[in-house]
A protein has these predicted regions:
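Outer-membrane beta-barrel signature, preferentially recognizing the C-terminal barrel domain
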Residues: 25, 258-277, 315-318, 390, ...
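N-terminal periplasmic "start-of-domain" segments of outer-membrane beta-barrel proteins
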Residues: 27-60, 88
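Non-catalytic regulatory/gating segments with a bias toward low-complexity or hydrophobic composition
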Residues: 57, 69, 130-131, 150-152, ...
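Extracytoplasmic beta-strand/coil segments of soluble accessory domains associated
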Residues: 66, 70-106, 110
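Short acidic/polar hinge/loop motifs at secondary-structure boundaries
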Residues: 107-134
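Periplasmic-side early beta-strands and strand-to-turn transitions of outer-membrane beta-barrels
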Residues: 139, 151, 158-160, 164-166, ...
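Structural signature of Gram-negative outer-membrane beta-barrels, strongest in the C-terminal barrel
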Residues: 234, 286, 332-336, 340-344, ...
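Gram-negative outer-membrane beta-barrel transporters
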Residues: 332, 372-379, 464-466, 483-561, ...
Length: 627
């Protein structure tokens, strides 16, 4: 599908005039849609932006969304084991629930239930590109966009057919196929499907998370299907419809319920999404209207009794979204505005909502964004008001200014507010819910420089984020939630990219001081320092790559040891680690490419969640056929 945010050639020409010269003069000024909900060149966006293409995903030979995101600036990924195990994404030191995860511009369903998005359940075979914006974006998108926005796009961008087959360590095997074909001059049909299975490994071998030791393999299986059709009615109107879904089964290590003789260590997730829309594009004006529906069923159960058996747990959620957006070119910039409506609902039969008085909430948001250029200065501003069916109106705003003070060098500064709405669980569940909760709020300052020095294109950013009204539960029964927490996060980020001879270098460094605003303790599972480096080069027809990732020291809790002195679980420290991956690819023919990868080359033993192992050294071999 073409983007519902599409602009005309005239519109893109205006934004090209606004583009930062250091970036605009390159051959890779990519077009994105996620920063302000319309198409614009990356170089015209004042916030730090990273775009990951399908070609890069294939080059890195990643096998999960988590593996892709861990390479990006400002991202920490904590995962309770290997592929398919529960994962959390931290951006710029904010909590996982403060990162907005979108799939094709629509908020991931489960975020409205648990508060954060578990990216381990999204099949990478569906992902065609990822747009990642750092900093506050609630003034554009509403709730969740505190630390940043990650938009996962599933649309195949080229005609043709691709077949892939991969085998690897721990019994890993994956098969996927995708095709895009034209029917006549105005209709395009796209289809994709995949199957993934891995035996996995014992993610909790030491039994030191408070549960019963389970010496077993914790495997994962995924099946996914994607179908879409787009039709160009005339030169101005496009319509599209699509449907996609996936089924996942995950084995994990769990706590034993001795009273009921239940060990619920298997997760089965079903997700179905249907959406459609229409877009209009003429001259300086464009508009879109779309509707999306998602139903997700998430079971946790003891395989001895079956998915619907004794003491099984079900989270059954429904999400609907309607979006209407408009964009018009004005002077040396543009103005955009729109309305979106969403409903999140917990369906009958869900385990944690048996005593709830209410099982849904609605949210309506109205937003306005603008960007203008005046010589070497670009200014942008956004404002948005959200009406929540429970707590009423909440307004956020942000502004950024960039000044190109010398050819190829720009200084940027900005301020923004953001918020996170209470989730369905926090408001209405049978345990600890509080219908009087207010949104968590954030105030953020950011400043930096970017430029091009010789072959190096770089950006240096410093930021501060004060978060208040954090929702926390009582430490004793009835464990009710209240707005009592605070956090202060300060950080510095440097990113760079350059070519030398046959080598292409991409690297980032981040320093984060993320602390509890009241106790001043460091926030858990966030590394103080990270260094990420990607080296790619070609020799003859070989395409070679080296990935280096240094993850600094982090804190966590030992949930197997309760310390009465602090009335909580024992704090622990996890040391830093250096990780290397190597990749190679060779085109056997014009259609067939063979790829190989060694992950964690030096077989480092480390954890991103205390008590849960990582995979160790792994080997993968892929065959890819295009026609």
């Amino acid at each position: 599908m073409t983007s519902p945010y599409a602009l005309s050639v005239v519109g893109l020409a205006v934004f090209s005039a606004l583009s930062f010269s250091a970036s605009a003069n390159t051959n890779d000024d990519q077009i994105i849609v996620s920063a302000n909900r319309f198409q614009q060149p990356v170089s015209s966006v004042l916030a730090p932006v990273t775009v990951v293409t399908r070609e890069e995903i294939d080059k890195w030979q990643s096998n999960s969304v988590a593996d892709v995101l861990r390479r990006l600036p400002g991202v920490d990924v904590a995962q309770s084991g290997g592929i398919g195990q529960t994962s959390s994404v931290f951006v710029r030191g904010t909590d996982a629930r403060h990162v907005m995860i979108l799939v094709d511009g629509v908020r991931l369903n489960q975020a409205n239930v648990s508060g954060s998005s578990d990216i381990s359940q999204i099949p990478l075979s569906m992902v065609q590109s990822i747009e990642y914006i750092r900093g506050p974006r609630s003034a554009v998108y509403g709730s969740d966009a505190v630390g940043g926005v990650i938009n996962i796009l599933t649309e195949r961008k080229t005609e043709g057919t691709t077949l892939n087959a991969t085998m690897g360590s721990h019994g890993y095997q994956e098969y996927d196929a995708s095709t895009q074909q034209k029917i006549g001059d105005r209709t395009t049909i796209t289809a994709a499907g995949s199957y993934l299975y891995t035996k996995g490994f014992d993610v909790e071998a030491n039994g030191n998370t408070g549960g019963v030791r389970q010496p077993d393999r914790d495997g994962f299986m995924n099946k996914s299907l994607w179908l879409g059709v787009k039709h160009q009615i005339n030169d101005n109107f496009d319509v599209y419809a699509r449907a996609y879904g996936f089924d996942n089964r995950t084995a994990y290590d769990a706590f034993y319920d001795s009273y009921n003789d239940v060990l619920a260590d298997t997760r089965q997730l079903y997700s179905r999404t249907y959406d459609g829309g229409i877009s209009y594009n003429r001259g300086i004006y464009s508009s879109f209207l779309n509707y999306s529906y998602n139903r997700t069923k998430d079971y946790n159960y003891d395989p001895r009794y079956g998915q619907y058996g004794k003491e099984h747990r079900l989270t059954d959620t429904e999400q609907q979204n309607v979006q209407w957006g408009n964009h018009v070119q004005v002077g040396n910039g543009s103005v955009s505005g729109g309305v979106d409506w969403s409903r999140q609902k917990m369906m009958d039969g869900s385990s944690d909502f048996t005593t709830a008085d209410k099982n849904y909430f609605d949210n309506t948001g109205v937003y306005l964004t603008g960007q203008q250029g005046l010589g070497p200065v670009i200014a942008e501003a956004s404002i948005r008001s959200d009406h929540h069916s429970d707590y009423g109106w909440h307004t956020t705003w942000q502004t950024n200014v960039g000044w190109e003070f010398a050819d190829g060098y720009r200084v940027i500064g900005g301020y923004g507010t953001a918020f996170k709405a209470p989730t369905l669980n926090q408001l209405y569940s049978a345990w600890g819910s509080n219908p009087n909760l207010k949104p968590e709020t954030s105030k953020q300052w950011e400043g930096g420089f970017e430029g091009i020095t010789g072959p190096l294109e770089w950006r240096l950013t410093t930021y501060r984020n004060d978060i208040e009204e954090l929702i926390q539960s009582e430490s004793s029964y009835p464990y009710q939630n209240y707005n009592v927490g605070e956090a202060r996060i300060e950080g510095v980020e440097f990113t760079g990219e350059m070519d030398t001879w046959i080598f292409h270098h991409t690297f980032s460094y981040q320093y984060i001081d993320a602390r509890n605003g009241k106790t001043h303790e460091r926030l858990e599972r966030r590394a103080r320092q990270q260094l990420k480096y990607q080296l790619d080069w070609n020799i003859e027809e070989w395409d070679l790559g080296l990935t280096y990732n240094y993850i600094g020291q982090r804190t966590d809790k030992d949930y197997g040891t309760f310390d009465p002195a602090i009335n909580g679980y024992k704090p622990v420290s996890m040391g830093g680690v250096s990780l290397f991956d190597v990749t190679a690819a060779y085109p056997v023919t014009d259609h067939l490419t063979i790829r190989g990868k060694v992950a964690n080359l030096f077989d480092k033993d480390y954890e991103t969640v205390y008590g849960y192992r990582t995979a160790g050294r792994e080997y993968f071999l892929t065959g890819s056929y295009n026609f």
